[in-house]
Each structure stands twice: as structure tokens, then as C-alpha cells.
Amino acid sequence: MAKAYGATRALSGIDLTVESGRIFGFLGPNGAGKTTTIRILLDLIRPDAGAATVLGFDCQRQSLEVRRRVGYLPGDLRLYESMRGDEFLDFIDSFRPEKRDPAYRRALVDRLDLDLTRRIRALSKGNRQKLGLVQALLHRPNLLVLDEPTSGLDPIVQDEVVRLLEEAAGEGRTVFFSSHVLPEVEKISQSVAIIRAGKIVAIEDVAKLKARSVHVIEVTFAAPPPPGLLALPGVRELRRDGATVHFQAHDGVDAVLKAIATQRVLDLRTQQPSLEDVFLAYYTDPELPQEERRASA
């Protein structure tokens, strides 16, 4: 798919497939194209090129069928200010009377510690977010599309939201959520896509992505470091303190460890990359053109 707003490219030919029954994280900073992608999937805006299907339905020609099966939480959540929370959920329930489940609704409200008796205009950002989450989860949709779902929530409620999403996936439903809170994505996602300046630069299972991504290694040699070590493909020196070298290995550690094994080593430490390390590696890639680097900021 591709989408531009005037001279600004929001999406540049992205190709993305999400398997059903999984929790899929969509990563990128503000302005990278996450929200534009979500809006196209829900037919809230139209792409300039390309097509998309959700649950087997064409996003444009069969958008009503898509929406019947999707629970959506927008990043710019807007609610009916004059309604109470319970009135708003009654309103949402009225669109899907066959899926009304008062017991499940009460459970969601209790778990998120939400007061439904107050007018929406009087709710804090966090409580509005809770209400938005309840309406998205309410009818147990086949697919949850959530744009920054834990925004404005305190850590205790964030943990409860994570449990709700894990339960949804455990029931065979799909969770597609965008976020820039990397520890949260790492904690619950099975797969992730990283979008940069409107392009998908990585799509992979979280464990595989981390395993073949950057490792930070610190080695203290008994003698000066071998000159060939830092010449290995994918090895980038960070700093050197006498016989101790700190460097990054971007193409796995096998070749690096073999080179180190030919020397007398006094100390060796390696740090398994977090998802944040992986993400930052993509966003600090020196091969990224300057215009794209600015666009993704």
C-alpha cells in the first residue's frame, strides 16, 4: 500500500501479513505511518495504491463486514462528552445486540477499575482510555486493532490490559496494536513489524528478531586486541579502554567468538539485545537517507 498527503509520503509500498490468533506489535515513532496504516485497514481513509484484506474481507469493498468483526481503539480517542460511561457502552452495545454480554461487560469494567456513573466530560485521560478499551473488547471481536492502547494508564492498569490482550489471543482472537512503548511490546507480542518513514524495515517473531540482531560485547584481552576483530563484517567499535574493547556485533556472534577464541581472553561479557536495542539499531542505521531520517523523527 502507498499513501501520501500532498508532497509528504506517509506510506511507501508497505507489505504486511498478520496471522490470525497472534499478538502482533506494530512499532514506530510518531509520524512513521502506524496510524495511517490502521486507518486504511478500517477504511477510514483510502490508499493511493494497493489493497488490503482483513479477516478475508476487502477493506474497501467490504468495509462493513470488516467493522462488524473488529474492535477498534483509535489513538486520538474522541467520545460523546455529554454521555455517562454506562450510556456510552449501552450505545455501543446497540450496534451488536446479538453479542451483548452483561456479565463480560461488568468484568471488564471491574478489572479496569472504571466508574461508569460519571459524565465522559468529567473523566481523566486515563479513564477515557479505559472506556475506549472496554468498548473495543466488549463484543469479543475476531480482531482487536488498538492504537497505543496503554496511553495514559497507570502501571497497574497497564498490566491488566496486557492480561486482557493475552486472554483474547488465548481464545484464538487476533490482536494488532501499535505502540512506541517498547518494553510493553516485547512483553506481550509474538511478532512485530518495525515501520520507518512509511516503510516496513523488519517483520519477524520477536525472539528471532532479537537473536539475529545487534549484540553488545565487551572483551578484555591479555594483549592488544587482534586487528582483524573489528574488521569482521557487522562489527562496529563503540570504545576502547586499553586492552578492553566494547563493540556491537550486527550479524550474530558466531564469527566474533571464533576470532576471540584465537586470543588469550581475561574477561568476556555479552548483552542479549532487548527489543528496544533492535528498534534503535534500525532507527540509527547510517545507511538511512537524511530525508527519511528527518521524516521519521
Predicted regions and their residues:
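Conserved ABC nucleotide-binding domain
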Residues: 102-122
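Hydrophobic anchor residue at the start of the ABC signature
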Residues: 133
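Conserved catalytic motifs of ABC-family nucleotide-binding domains
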Residues: 140
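Catalytic Walker B motif of ABC-type/P-loop ATPase nucleotide-binding domains
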Residues: 144-148
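ABC transporter nucleotide-binding domain
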Residues: 161-248
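Short, charged/small-residue-rich alpha-helical element at the C-terminal edge
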Residues: 215-289
